UniProtKB/Swiss-Prot annotation:
Superkingdom of origin: Eukaryota
Gene3D superfamilies linked to this entry: 1.20.5.1500, Nucleosome assembly protein
Protein name: Testis-specific Y-encoded protein 2
MF terms in GO: chromatin binding; histone binding
InterPro entries: NAP-like_sf, NAP_family
Primary role: May be involved in sperm differentiation and proliferation.
Primary site of residence: cytoplasm
UniProt entry tagged with the keyword Cytoplasm: yes
GO CC entries: chromatin; cytoplasm; nucleus
Secretion signal, residue range per the UniProt entry: none
């Protein structure tokens, strides 16, 4: 009687019917008990002549090989069954957790609105923090800018040289413009970024034969792509120069410094405003001196020759 839960494997026909002298059948029974683990019991019943020992030995070797094959097969099947069982458990666990499921357009918009409502105070807090930081940095810059302005006052014609030496501005300035700029004593740029981004350019002049203004202010609204003219101080030309100013403004319709200076809404004037605000004002010293081109037939040395 086999133990309950045991697995029985029968030896193939080639082992059950051997070629012994009497032609009697040999039978092997292998019992693998599930409770005993890997214990196997093999019983062989032989009928025939007792003197044929060599054939019995051959049959024994084949039986051992068969048992090895059976055990290997059982191990492979057990591993496959365990893998399948683990996959099924994972699938059941995944199905047990309720997922969000597909969202309809209406529910997606509701969810988006809820997220946006939560995001608004975060954005407002970030704007306030950025504004406070910007104001803090402006306060730190102001004493340095004031000191720089005071030092520039001691350098005659500083701003005239800076503007005339700038690679882009130099193409927009005539000899008459340079003479007018020679009376310029200071340049200041202020930026306001509270409600709108406003760039204010202030040009300070000493007494000159062209106009009466001591300060000329030009304001521009700034966005990502451009500087847009907002306000400008009207220029009070002296009567002796007013006719010439009119002639210059209408004689040359291309963009130049005089047209920008005298006509705030002149096409392309935002280009000059951007150069003054973003480049010249931030570091004018780099344009105060310019490189002198090497003379023909001379070699350039390591030391740069500068012109003021």
């Amino acid at each position: 009687m086999r133990p309950e839960g045991s697995l029985t494997y029968r030896v193939p026909e080639r082992l059950r019917q051997g070629s012994c002298g009497v032609g009697r059948a040999a039978q092997a029974l292998v019992c693998a008990s599930a409770k005993e683990g890997t214990a196997f019991r093999m019983e062989a019943v032989q009928e025939g002549a007792a003197g044929v020992e060599s054939e019995q030995a051959a049959l024994g070797e084949e039986a051992v090989l068969l048992l090895d094959d059976i055990m290997a097969e059982v191990e492979v099947v057990a591993e496959e069954e365990g893998l399948v069982e683990r996959r099924e458990e994972a699938q059941r666990a995944q199905q047990a957790v309720p997922g969000p499921g597909p969202m309809t357009p209406e529910s997606a918009l509701e969810e988006l609105l809820a997220v946006q409502v939560e995001l608004e105070p975060v954005n407002a807090q970030a704007r306030k923090a950025f504004s406070r930081q910007r104001e803090k940095m402006e306060r730190r810059r102001k004493p340095h800018l004031d000191r720089r302005g005071a030092v520039i006052q001691s350098v005659p014609g500083f701003w005239a040289n800076v503007i005339a030496n700038h690679p882009q501005m130099s193409a927009l300035i005539t000899d008459e413009d340079e003479d007018m700029l020679s009376y310029m004593v200071s340049l200041e740029v202020e930026e306001e970024k509270h409600r709108v981004h406003l760039c204010k350019i202030m040009l300070f002049f000493r007494s000159n034969p062209y106009f009466q203004n001591k300060v000329i202010t030009k304001e521009y609204l700034v966005n990502i792509t451009e500087y847009r003219a907002s306000h400008s101080t009207p220029i009070e030309w002296y009567p002796d120069y007013e006719v010439e100013a009119y002639r210059r403004r209408h004689h040359n319709s291309s963009l130049n410094f005089f047209n920008w200076f005298s006509d705030h809404n002149f096409a392309g004037s935002n280009k000059i405003a951007e150069i003054l605000c973003k480049d010249l004002w931030r570091n004018p010293l780099q344009y105060y001196k310019r490189m002198k081109p090497p003379e023909e037939g001379t070699e350039t040395s390591g030391d740069s020759q500068l012109l003021s």
